[in-house]
Amino acid sequence: MNSKCKVLVVDDIHENIELVADMLKGLDVEIQKADGGAKAIELVDSFQPNIILLDLMMPQVNSWDVIKYVRASYDKSEMAIIVVSLLNNKDNIDDCYEMGVNDYICKPIIKAQLVSSVETHKENIVEPTPKASPTMVALHNKNHDNKAIFGM
């Protein structure tokens, strides 16, 4: 990855966002903050983070929705999701990995563990390859059909 790594910190508790952002100071990363799932989804499209640090327990648009949204458009190697959560039971952790999460950190957060995970995933991120939307596929097919009809 050539440009500065972009990290999106997502939690519904402001103090947790600030704590995580403070732990990342000193790393060569650009940080954006989201106070919930809806804002996170908005920033996935506009900010296009390389790494998302995501709390699991959020109201309204929850973390599962964010994970599904991200994985519908980005591969694990293109946009890493690191869950940071109080939920430390095996079923939750397994569910997260099955949904495409890259790493899982249990709260309370240990700075060395967080920094290590971010650094590891920062090194492994590849540039995203845009996935074709259904509209683009339809336009491509129509153009291909027109060329066949008109002998182009």
Over which residues does each language-model region extend?
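Receiver (REC) domain active-site loop signature in two-component systems and cognate sites
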Residues: 58
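CheY-like receiver
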Residues: 123-152
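Helix N-cap/capping motif at the beta->alpha junctions
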Residues: 33-42, 63
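Two-component/phosphorelay signaling modules centered on CheY-like receiver
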Residues: 14-32
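Short amphipathic alpha-helix used as the core "switch/output" element in two-component signaling
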Residues: 42, 64-77
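Alpha4 helix (beta4-alpha4-beta5 surface) of REC/receiver domains from two-component response regulators
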Residues: 21, 65, 88-103, 116
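Active-site beta3 strand of CheY-like receiver
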Residues: 47-53
